[in-house]
A protein has these predicted regions:
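Bacterial N-terminal signal peptides that target proteins for export
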Residues: 2-14
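Bacterial N-terminal signal peptides
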Residues: 13-24
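Sec/Tat signal peptide C-region and signal peptidase I cleavage site
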Residues: 25-33
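Extracellular/periplasmic metallocenter environments
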Residues: 33-50, 72-75, 91-126
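Short beta-strand segments of immunoglobulin-like
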Residues: 51-58
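Short coil/turn motif common to extracellular beta-sandwich-like domains
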Residues: 59-66
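Beta-strand signatures of extracellular beta-sandwich domains
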Residues: 67, 76-80
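Short edge-strand/loop segments of extracellular domains
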Residues: 82-86
């Protein structure tokens, strides 16, 4: 093998290795995309959790971005489940907030603490 042929062969192997690495990285990045769930509390006495416009009843375990729209200063949004117990919006807060969550397999419950007897919901992760 001449030096010129050896150099071309090495360059071709390097190009293929870079292409394979880039493809693996982009596929891993796409698979690891963080899903967004949307919570709403208020106006009135309503509390919801949706994904893609549909009520959340079951999710896969993993990382999520949780965007809460709190439309009333008399409510909070409290989420609890395996290894998680967080008040995502406080009673005096109105506006939108975002949190990163890691959900593990199990049952989850969300509620407005001051009105927990009738403002609540649940979903499963598994």
């Amino acid at each position: 093998m001449t030096t010129f042929t050896h150099t071309r062969f090495s360059a071709a192997i390097l190009a293929v290795a870079i292409a394979v690495a880039a493809l693996a990285w982009s596929a891993g990045g796409a698979a690891a995309a963080v899903q967004t769930v949307n919570g709403t509390v208020g106006p009135g006495f309503t509390i919801t959790l949706t994904m893609h416009g549909k009520k959340v009843t079951k999710l896969k375990a993993g990382k999520y971005r949780c965007v809460i729209s709190d439309r009333s200063s008399i409510h909070d949004f409290h989420l609890s489940g395996p290894g998680l117990d967080r008040v995502l919006t406080a009673v005096d807060f109105t506006g939108t907030t975002s949190s990163s969550l890691t959900l593990k397999k199990g049952s989850y419950h969300f509620q407005c603490d001051p009105h927990a007897s009738f403002m609540h919901g649940a979903f499963r992760v598994g």
